[in-house]
């Protein structure tokens, strides 16, 4: 839930997002090198803040006698305890406790991808690290996919997401990877997969996602479905949008669509 969403990378603000996929979301690009320790520290602070939040509501409900204030603190106790529980005792890689743990390498992968994104946005064409090359987490696979395209290995790249479970993707991962799965199915002529993904694809494209992969996947999807006119309009939008992308992205896209 959120009244607006902010994307610092593109300098865009979307108001009245409410319950949309990007509701209350804030996106930004790192301006300097990020380390796994930085990310684990932020996650640890999140656990501490959640614990403090829960303690305040529980303590307030115990010591305050005035009716209105008492109701306020009592109402807040349940969500406070819920947040404390899911944020502290959840083993999912995306929750603060799991990210803060050194047994989980998600912080390492996240730091690496943030640094790669910073270099890409600065107009550089970075080298693929060993971590990105061997890790099988979705966001690492996405960057491995881009690096594989940079090398000109299109056929190999199109198979990278074959074993990804769409239901396990986060919203951000879904926005990046789902259109690539659709595009791969279209160019490989996999009608069975397109039929399986068709409803989800229609819903996804109806939200007008702005990333370049989604534009490319959308025109390929419309062409596969036989709507040549719509496909050409979308392809024109894709070509125009590609002009403003960093060299790394342009090279990957050129190798994918040639």
Annotate each PLM feature:
Residues 31-119:
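Hydrophobic transmembrane alpha-helical segments that form the core helix bundle
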Residues 147-148, 183-187, 220-222:
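Residue-level signature for tetratricopeptide repeat
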Residues 1-3, 89, 185:
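Catalytic Zn2+-binding segment of zinc metalloproteases
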Residues 105-160:
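Alpha-helical segment of the N-proximal tetratricopeptide repeat
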Residues 124-134, 154-168, 190-205, 227-241:
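Alpha-helical repeat scaffolds
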